[in-house]
Each structure stands twice: as C-alpha cells, then as structure tokens.
Amino acid sequence: MAKRGESLRDKPKWSLEGMTALVTGGSKGLGKAVVEELAMLGARVHTCARDETQLQESLREWQAKGLQVTTSVCDVSSRDQREKLMETVSSLFQGKLSILVPNVGIGVLKPTTECTAEEFSFIIATNLESTFHFSQLAHPLLKASGSGNIVLMSSVAGVVNLGNTSIYGATKGAMNQLARNLACEWASDNIRANSVCPWFITTPSTKDFLGDKDVKEKVESVTPLRRVGEANEVSSLVAFLCLPAASYITGQTICVDGGFTINGFSLP
C-alpha cells in the first residue's frame, strides 16, 4: 500500500503536468491570475463566472497563449448551479480533480448595525456556504486523484480587523478554520488544504477604491513593503501550494500582505 502523499512526492517538484484544477470566479482579477498560473505550470483548468461575455473574452486570451482551459457559466451562490458545475468538472476530468480553488468572494463595507439580513445571507452563501459545499462535492474527485489540493481564497480580513467588514471578515475567518479542519479530516485521503489571505491587491474590484489617493496612501502607510500587491504575487503562492514541492504543507493560513498583519507599533 502506498504511503500518504507518496504519489505526489514522486512527481516532478515544480510542475503541474497531468493535474486538473477547478478555479471559481476565474474570468478576472485574482481568479484569472490563478487560472493562468496553474495552466502555465501544465495543469488542465476549468473555471466559471457569472458573466458569459467576460468569460469568453478571457477564454480567447487563454487559447491564444496555448493554455488548457475550459469554462462554464455558474453563479456559485446557487446550490443547484454548484452541483451542475461539479458534474461538468467530473465529466471533463474523468472523475478526478487534483486542485480546487474556491475563489469567488463578495463583501459589503458598512457598520455592523447597518447590515441587513439579506446582505448577511447573500455574503454567507457566496463566500462560506459555497466554499464548504464545493469542498464536499469535490472530495470524491480529489480523493480519486491520489493527491488532492484545496486552496481557499481567504483574506487578511479573516485574520485581523479591517473595520466595517464584520460579515465578510466572519466568512473569511471561518474559511481559515475550514481549511484546518479539512487538512486534518481528509489527510488520510491524501488531500491537503490551506488558505491564502491577500491584503489589498491591484484588481478590477479594487480599482475604484484604490483610485482614491488618500485611501491608497493610508493602505501603503500600514504596509511594511509600502505598496499594494499584484495579482500574480497571490497566484504564485496558490500555485506553489499545489505543487509536489509543497507536499508537506497543509492546514496553514498564509497571508500575502506585504507584512501588513505583522506590522506593530514603531517609535518615531
């Protein structure tokens, strides 16, 4: 009988050749960067998004680069659509999935006392419930691959307070704990799970927010590296965690934040 993780350790350390991946929300931003990073390392990737036009534009870009990427439309807040997506993935990859990256996430910036029940339910469903459900649905496929990887796209909001993000932060904190639980519960199935927590990253979703000079300067002032991150600085970590080189890393919460979460008080 093979030892746990043996099949992964026997593969080339810095290649994802022969592996398959599902990345949700891959038509733009961090998700798109993750799709490209995994595909450039040799993985066959399936991704989804709600906007079919944007998805097709991205697909044309990937095809022009010779990347092995397929797409489908899916609203991950819908349980039925999540189940349909996983049926598609199972069919595409012959019942085996090497990598799961639930990337879709939304939030609302307002005081806790002003948040509505509808906002709470939608954010929980989109961020946390979908991640939990995708993990459940993917488990048999990840197990069948012989060496499965789950990378949850969390946030520093799940590690420290960001202010006026109580619902969003709660979902991300729960995702970090979910990764730890899955890492322990599914270790015997040769499935690893980790969570990645970005700080402010230059993406279409942060463009307007960071376009405010005062906001950007404030963000940079509390970041030791004194700059906002780039999408490929997050996607490279996600890809690394999926590589055979990272076969002994599981259950970890890793911040990609230019030092923000460890920045204490400095005397003048």
Swiss-Prot record:
Give the domain of life: Eukaryota
**Residues binding NADP(+):** 22-46
Q: Does the keyword Oxidoreductase apply?
A: yes
EC supergroup of this enzyme: oxidoreductase
What keywords would UniProt list here? NADP, Oxidoreductase
Catalytic site: 168 (proton acceptor)
Listed binding positions for substrate are 155
For molecular function, the Gene Ontology terms on record are: oxidoreductase activity
Query: What Pfam families has UniProt attached to this entry?
Result: adh_short_C2
List the GO cellular component terms.
Answer: cytosol; peroxisome
Which E.C. number(s) belong to this protein? 1.1.1.-
The family line of this record is: Belongs to the short-chain dehydrogenases/reductases (SDR) family. SDR65C subfamily.
Q: What is this protein's record name?
A: Tropinone reductase homolog At2g29370
Q: Which organism is it from?
A: Arabidopsis thaliana
